[in-house]
Regions:
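Beta-lactamase-like hydrolase cores
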Residues: 1-42
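Contiguous, well-ordered alpha-helical segments that form the cores/surfaces of helical PPI scaffolds
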Residues: 23-26, 53-61, 138-142, 197-201
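Active-site-proximal alpha-helical segments within enzyme catalytic domains
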Residues: 187-212
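Short, contiguous, pocket-lining structural segments
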Residues: 17, 46-47, 128-132, 153-160, ...
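A short glycine/serine-rich beta->alpha loop
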Residues: 38-46, 74-78, 121-130, 181-187
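Active-site-adjacent helix/loop patches that line small-molecule binding or acyl-intermediate pockets
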Residues: 1-3, 69-176, 199-202
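Short active-site loop at a secondary-structure junction
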Residues: 18-21, 36-54, 69-72
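Active-site SXXK
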Residues: 47-64, 83
Length: 212
């Protein structure tokens, strides 16, 4: 049986512990060997947006042309600030698409300031404002490049999603334990914390010019 979560931090006020935060952590070496482990680091979890780095690697393998800030938008969540939204539009424009192609649910920006500005301007929630729209736009651009269907690009059986699952397994060194539906409607893939750490170690030590 895996070790349960452990106390990682305490909130102390005037010498009295008023709160404890439990969790699990793992640190791996460049070769993926475990250096430090606390709590349960072997049971699968849904890393949610932490998987985006691996999925973006899969998109690069398929030919996604975005680089620099447009690759960053594919590899992480964004706050919905104007420059983020403009970047998502650039990804879509380059593929001959507009934001109507996005299947992200309508949302407000994560940025409170950006949300307040939109509310004052009388704007509404929109799919492009959702924090995962960069990844979705990059998937759509890859579909266009590969001449693949757009309407069902979020389906786990879609060729791009199948490849992204393979990228997660290859980079993490572990088979996906379960597939769910993330808040953006795209597949979310379960791996262990150790596998997630190994994936980031692989990315951080990758050769320049490699997909990672």
């Amino acid at each position: 049986m895996a070790e349960p979560s452990v106390v990682l931090a305490e909130v102390v006020r005037s010498g009295f512990v008023e709160g404890r935060h439990r969790g699990s952590l793992v640190v791996v070496d460049v070769d993926g060997s475990v250096l430090v482990a606390r709590g349960d680091v072997t049971s699968p979890v849904f890393p949610r947006s932490s998987n985006k780095l691996m999925q973006a690697t899969g998109l690069v393998e398929l030919g996604y042309p975005g680089r620099d800030e447009l690759l960053a938008l594919a590899a992480a969540s964004h706050d919905g600030e104007p420059h983020h939204v403009a970047g998502v539009r650039r990804i879509l424009d380059a593929a001959g698409l507009d934001e109507q192609a996005l299947r992200t649910p309508p949302d407000w920006p994560l940025s409170t300031a950006a949300r307040d500005d939109l509310v004052r301007a009388g704007e509404s929630m929109a799919p492009i404002l959702m924090n995962c729209s960069g990844k979705h736009a990059a998937i759509l651009a890859t579909c266009v490049l590969r001449d693949l269907p757009l309407d069902d690009y979020r389906a786990p059986s879609h060729p791009v999603q199948v490849h992204l699952r393979g990228a997660v397994e290859r980079m993490s060194g572990e088979p996906v334990a379960a597939t769910g539906v993330d808040g953006c409607g795209a597949p979310v893939l379960a791996i262990s914390l150790t596998a997630l750490a190994r994936a980031y170690s692989r990315a951080g030590t990758a050769d320049v010019g490699s997909p990672e």
